[in-house]
Swiss-Prot record:
It is found in: Cell membrane. It comes from the Bacteria. The keyword Membrane applies. UDP-N-acetyl-alpha-D-glucosamine binds at S195, Q287. GO terms for biological process: carbohydrate metabolic process; cell division; cell wall organization; lipid glycosylation; peptidoglycan biosynthetic process; regulation of cell shape. InterPro entries: GlcNAc_MurG, Glyco_trans_28_C, GlycoTrans_28_N. It comes from Streptococcus pneumoniae serotype 4 (strain ATCC BAA-334 / TIGR4). This is UDP-N-acetylglucosamine--N-acetylmuramyl-(pentapeptide) pyrophosphoryl-undecaprenol N-acetylglucosamine transferase. Its EC number is 2.4.1.227. Belongs to the glycosyltransferase 28 family. MurG subfamily. PANTHER family: UDP-N-ACETYLGLUCOSAMINE--N-ACETYLMURAMYL-(PENTAPEPTIDE) PYROPHOSPHORYL-UNDECAPRENOL N-ACETYLGLUCOSAMINE TRANSFERASE, UDP-N-ACETYLGLUCOSAMINE--N-ACETYLMURAMYL-(PENTAPEPTIDE) PYROPHOSPHORYL-UNDECAPRENOL N-ACETYLGLUCOSAMINE TRANSFERASE 1. It catalyses: Mur2Ac(oyl-L-Ala-gamma-D-Glu-L-Lys-D-Ala-D-Ala)-di-trans,octa-cis-undecaprenyl diphosphate + UDP-N-acetyl-alpha-D-glucosamine = beta-D-GlcNAc-(1->4)-Mur2Ac(oyl-L-Ala-gamma-D-Glu-L-Lys-D-Ala-D-Ala)-di-trans,octa-cis-undecaprenyl diphosphate + UDP + H(+). GO terms for molecular function: undecaprenyldiphospho-muramoylpentapeptide beta-N-acetylglucosaminyltransferase activity. Pathway: Cell wall biogenesis; peptidoglycan biosynthesis.
Length: 352
């Protein structure tokens, strides 16, 4: 039986594509393994998925771009992670390794290359993350969402592979209940912040609940179960699975962070959106670059977190609603998307 090893983690964005691809390989008779951190979000997501995947936990160290005494300890963690990954590779002898990035992916990528296993990696952002900059040196091939420099000879630009379904699925009963609390005459605004980026949206909704619910139906994906609430013109929930796409479709506008996975999902369904990227104090600035790219293309409006107020947000919402047809036309004309089926076929072809 053919074997494939996946790696990637630290944030949901470094796991999502793997979660989409793994069922495809399982259906085609592959034995699927995953290398990550048992305390990381990658392990949580795989457990929740229920997929028939063997998880291998390794030591991980964070890759920092700045000086920290913690770097010295993490060098040893990464080194031990490489040794652990090498033993896994030599024991499994897989046909390939697929990496979605994140600091946990560096040891498996290096170990795969050392053991002669082909390495395929994926980069979602406009600028390459530090983990993928290292991984690229060991990779057989890199797939990218955005165009990369021509000097990177091993990169193939494939566009965004989104998890948005093309099928019309039945409305969940819970969605019907939510809609009975909404005013059909008001626009619906969905706030979605990812695994760590929702706090600023949560605070905005909490501070301006009255004003917001007078003018909009508000959906707030909080990541915090203590905020769960369903009342007139307001639905706050910590986490959704089957409801995720129906809520996206229900919304007239989405207010989101600038992670590539989410904004390309919005592009795929031509959904109006305001991007509030994580700042450089909380990230390497990739979300700022992603947001600027989408604004330049005419797909979205952006708003820096430091400028986020009720008034500034409402100005952006009003502008998008007033120019809805223009934004949607540009999104629908985009050629920057790739279906999961097409990407899977491309990957299988490259593996053969």
């Amino acid at each position: 039986m053919k074997k494939i090893v996946f790696t990637g983690g630290g944030t949901v964005g470094h796991v999502t594509l793997n979660l989409l691809l793994m069922p495809k390989f399982i259906e085609d008779g592959w034995e699927v393994h995953y290398i990550g951190d048992k305390c990381g979000i990658e392990h949580q997501e795989i457990l929740k998925s229920g997929l028939d995947v063997t998880f291998h936990s390794i030591a991980t160290g964070k890759l920092r771009r700045y000086f920290s005494w913690q770097n010295m300890l993490d060098v040893f963690k990464v080194g031990w992670g490489i040794v652990q990954s090498l033993f896994i590779m030599l024991r499994l002898r897989p046909q390939t390794l697929f990496s979605k990035g994140g600091f946990v992916s560096v040891p498996p990528v290096i170990a795969a290359r050392v053991s002669g296993v082909p390495v395929f990696i994926h980069e979602s952002d406009l600028s390459m993350g530090l983990a993928n900059k290292i991984a690229y040196k060991f990779a057989t091939k890199m797939y990218s969402t955005f165009e990369q420099a021509s000097s990177l000879a091993k990169v193939e630009h494939v566009g965004a592979v989104t998890k948005v379904s093309d099928k019309n699925t039945p409305e969940p009963d819970e969605l019907v209940d939510i809609q009975t609390h909404f005013n059909p005459k008001l626009p619906t605004v969905l706030f979605v912040g990812g695994s760590a980026g929702a706090r600023v949206f949560n605070q905005l909704v909490t501070d301006h609940k009255k004003e917001l619910t007078e003018r909009y139906n508000i959906i707030n994906l909080t990541g915090d179960s203590s905020l769960n609430e369903l009342r007139q013109n307001l639905f706050r929930v910590d986490y959704v699975t089957d409801l995720y796409q129906p809520l996206m479709e229900l919304a007239d506008i989405v207010v989101t962070r600038g992670g590539a996975n989410t904004i390309f999902e919005l592009l795929a369904i031509a959904k109006l959106h305001v991007i509030v990227p994580l700042g450089r104090e909380a990230s390497r600035g990739d979300q700022i670059e992603n947001a600027a790219y989408f604004v330049k293309k005419g797909y979205a409006e952006d708003l820096q977190e430091s400028d986020l107020t009720l008034d500034s947000l409402e100005e952006k919402l009003s502008h998008l609603l007033s120019h809805k047809e223009d934004y949607q036309a540009k999104m629908k004309a985009s050629k920057e998307l790739k279906s999961l089926a097409d990407f899977y076929q491309l990957l299988k072809k490259d593996l053969s």
